[in-house]
């Protein structure tokens, strides 16, 4: 059996809706429990997007892949278009094919990539990348992948997507399909295909602003859409003295605060991309994006940002009897054998796309339209407000540094009156609204710009950055 498939099959995939834990700790807390965040399901909007109904569309991406056949369980069937778009209905399964070769059958989602189509097979993931990129008519996947109908029709059902990638790239079946489609140039090597897919990691992850929040805490991630990896992260979550393995001590490990820096992806597997970051500003210690575990992977299905980790399954402890506790009667101490296999499972937690009301206050707003390193304001539909501030007030840096605010708000769309009060978190001192509150929020007609006036009559021009 293929070693990569053996390793993946040893893992049990479970989804854990761990709300509002700092990004770097959420997965380990999901595995071990006893975290400092709110209880699961405790808010009006947490990780995980809302379930939709009816017809919708998704995109097949390495870069956009056109010319791949698809069939949705509700009946929609065609080829992906030049933007990689396919049609399906919420709740569908969708099967993708090239000619008679089944590429994979998956649950319909806003974004489907070879990671989803590959299931748990590392070889299949690599070979799908080689196949799609090598059938691109102009040989340049950077401008999209366009597979000619004649090439797709010539893809043989005998092609083994689980074979060794080097052998797959050299296979006669792949070359025949390329010749049938008039595709010139060389077949993409495994390294070339991998490098290109890695280059798409940050653009995929920046498709939305990602949030987890409830009535007591919030965590937000914004990655620049320019592709350069610039990011802003805010954590309004409780102080925690436990590390990612839930080993606790007297030293504070994570706290509410802000991160700003540059991020990238260094590798990938069937669970997602390995996220790496270089923070320039980091006031939240090990919370946020600056200290991910080595086994954490991140991907997006278009609606959610999905974080997963491989964790050790904790052995269940037998409950001692009351009699045994009282009289200190214990059985033989059970020692696990060195030969006993270590059981692991995959734990997942999710951020949802920031909600957005096109003609209302709900959404994300930034003080600078083009920069990520700017004060950013989040108005949630549950009446909660968060400010993520990577700059503070430079004129009073000692008391007004970078940080976050989390509070309640009320807004009257008729009078434009805005009130922000009841601050649960305030780590940027005098730089935000905790000392000089808001008085009005005046939306412009287009809904994309607004003027926020503070109680001291100073005004802030804001730009909608959620969508």
Residue ranges and their predicted role:
Residues 1-15:
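N-terminal secretory signal peptides that target proteins for export/translocation
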Residues 2, 25-54, 467:
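Bacterial Sec-dependent N-terminal signal peptides
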Residues 49-169:
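Beta-strand-dominated extracellular/periplasmic modules and repeats
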Residues 199-211, 222, 348-366, 378:
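N-terminal helix-cap/turn-to-beta initiation motif at the start of protein domains
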Residues 236-328, 337-340, 370-371, 389-457:
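Contiguous, well-ordered beta-strand patches that form the walls/edges
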């Amino acid at each position: 059996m293929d070693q990569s498939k053996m390793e993946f099959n040893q893992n049990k995939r479970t989804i854990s809706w761990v709300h509002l834990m700092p990004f770097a700790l959420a997965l380990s807390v999901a595995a071990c429990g006893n975290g400092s965040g709110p209880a699961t399901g405790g808010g009006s909007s947490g990780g995980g997007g809302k379930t939709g109904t009816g017809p919708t569309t998704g995109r097949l991406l390495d870069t956009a892949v056109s010319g791949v056949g698809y069939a949705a369980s509700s009946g929609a069937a065609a080829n992906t278009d030049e933007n990689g778009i396919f049609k399906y209905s919420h709740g569908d399964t969708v099967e993708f094919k090239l000619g008679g070769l089944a590429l994979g059958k998956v649950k319909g989602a806003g974004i489907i990539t070879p990671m989803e189509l590959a299931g748990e097979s590392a070889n299949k993931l690599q070979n799908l990348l080689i196949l799609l990129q090598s059938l691109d008519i102009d040989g340049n996947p950077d401008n999209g992948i366009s597979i000619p109908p004649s090439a797709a029709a010539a893809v043989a059902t005998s092609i083994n997507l689980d074979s060794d990638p080097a052998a797959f790239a050299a296979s006669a079946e792949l070359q025949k399909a390329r010749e049938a489609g008039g595709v010139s140039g060389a077949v993409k090597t495994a390294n070339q295909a991998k490098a290109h897919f890695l280059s798409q990691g940050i653009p995929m992850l920046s498709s939305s602003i990602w949030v987890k929040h409830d009535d007591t805490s919030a965590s937000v991630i914004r990655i620049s859409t320019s592709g350069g990896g610039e990011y802003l992260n805010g954590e309004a979550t409780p102080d925690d003295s436990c590390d990612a393995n839930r080993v606790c001590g007297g030293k504070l490990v994570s706290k509410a605060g802000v991160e700003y820096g540059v991020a990238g992806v260094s590798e990938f597997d069937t669970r997602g991309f390995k996220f790496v970051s270089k923070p320039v500003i980091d006031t939240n210690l090990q919370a946020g994006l600056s200290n991910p575990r080595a086994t954490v992977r991140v991907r997006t299905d278009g609606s959610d940002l999905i974080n997963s980790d491989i964790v050790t399954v904790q052995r269940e402890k037998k409950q001692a009897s009351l009699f045994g506790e009282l009289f200190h009667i214990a059985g033989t101490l059970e020692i696990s054998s060195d030969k006993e296999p270590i059981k692991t499972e995959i734990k997942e937690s999710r951020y949802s796309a920031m909600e957005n009301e096109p003609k209302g206050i709900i959404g994300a707003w930034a003080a600078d339209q083009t920069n990520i390193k700017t004060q950013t304001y989040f108005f949630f539909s549950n009446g909660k407000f968060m400010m993520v501030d990577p700059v503070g007030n430079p004129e009073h840096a000692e008391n007004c540094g970078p940080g976050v605010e989390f509070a309640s708000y009320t807004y009257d769309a008729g009078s434009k009156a805005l009130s922000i009060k009841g601050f649960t978190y305030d780590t940027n001192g005098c730089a935000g609204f905790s000392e000089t509150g808001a008085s009005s929020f005046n939306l412009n007609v287009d809904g994309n710009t607004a003027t926020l006036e503070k109680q001291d009559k100073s005004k802030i021009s804001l730009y909608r950055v959620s969508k």
